[in-house]
Amino acid sequence: MAIHLYKTSTPSTRNGAVDSQVKSNPRNNLICGQHHCGKGRNARGIITARHRGGGHKRLYRKIDFRRNAKDIYGRIVTIEYDPNRNAYICLIHYGDGEKRYILHPRGAIIGDTIVSGTEVPIKMGNALPLTDMPLGTAIHNIEITLGRGGQLARAAGAVAKLIAKEGKSATLKLPSGEVRLISKNCSATVGQVGNVGVNQKSLGRAGSKCWLGKRPVVRGVVMNPVDHPHGGGEGRAPIGRKKPVTPWGYPALGRRTRKRKKYSETLILRRRSK
């Protein structure tokens, strides 16, 4: 990823950075409109997810997470920007004439060939079942349910590791540090998702954050008591509690939010690390 730093002409561009090489030129048959209603509101218009709203209009790119074009070689034609995710996408031209978008694997360049199937080489960008991969393989775009398409490790820079295979299940270490079991018949893509340094790029100003649909975040300690439990006081006052709480009074630090009786509880061998 080539980062272009702005010249220090104005305060808003003094610390800004953009990608100078990756552009967006989507194909008409691989995009569709999406209706963003609410933006953090429920059916009654009440805010249910804070700090969301606004943002630039987007066209959705149809990404091939299933990789079900078996044993057909494809060639990477372009590497494009996708406004709906922080990872880049690749336009693939397959040998049968079909064109699809996939997530851009780290290190893949224009002209590389990829393929998906059961007996394909362990090469970056190839998709194959976990049962055909050797231990220690770095993977992304991992299926949870067979045939449903990849659902895990799809963000920029995400990578999981295949650490064991026993019986009908494979043991994976996910990017969060969680260790869990997944069926060996599920597919995954070899390699790491590209655009690794996206979290190190500085937007430079608040307006760039608003273009992404993210609203400002206000600290509770500067609010009034009617708006937040941390609010109130004369001048710069402490929160007045032993531990921080959420705007609704629940503990903000250390509280577990996962449901206890979830179906996948028996599949998780080690909880994610913070």
UniProtKB/Swiss-Prot annotation:
Q: Name one GO molecular function term.
A: transferase activity
- PROSITE patterns per the UniProt record, alphabetical: RIBOSOMAL_L2
What InterPro entries does UniProt report for this protein, alphabetically? NA-bd_OB-fold, Rib_uL2_dom2, Ribosomal_uL2, Ribosomal_uL2_bac/org-type, Ribosomal_uL2_C, Ribosomal_uL2_CS, Ribosomal_uL2_dom3, Ribosomal_uL2_RNA-bd_dom
Region annotated Disordered, chain positions = 1-21, 225-274
Identify the keywords attached in UniProt to this record, alphabetized. Answer: Chloroplast, Plastid, Ribonucleoprotein, Ribosomal protein
Which residues span the membrane?
none
Q: Which GO terms describe its biological process?
A: translation
* First-listed, main subcellular location of the protein, grouped into a coarse class: plastid
Q: Where in the cell is it found?
A: Plastid, Chloroplast
Source domain of life? Eukaryota
What Gene Ontology terms describe where this protein resides (cellular component)?
chloroplast; chloroplast envelope; chloroplast stroma; large ribosomal subunit; plastid
Question: What family does the database annotate?
Answer: Belongs to the universal ribosomal protein uL2 family.
Relate the assembly described in the record: Part of the 50S ribosomal subunit.
- Mind telling me what this protein is named? Large ribosomal subunit protein uL2cz/uL2cy
What species is this protein from?
Arabidopsis thaliana (Mouse-ear cress)
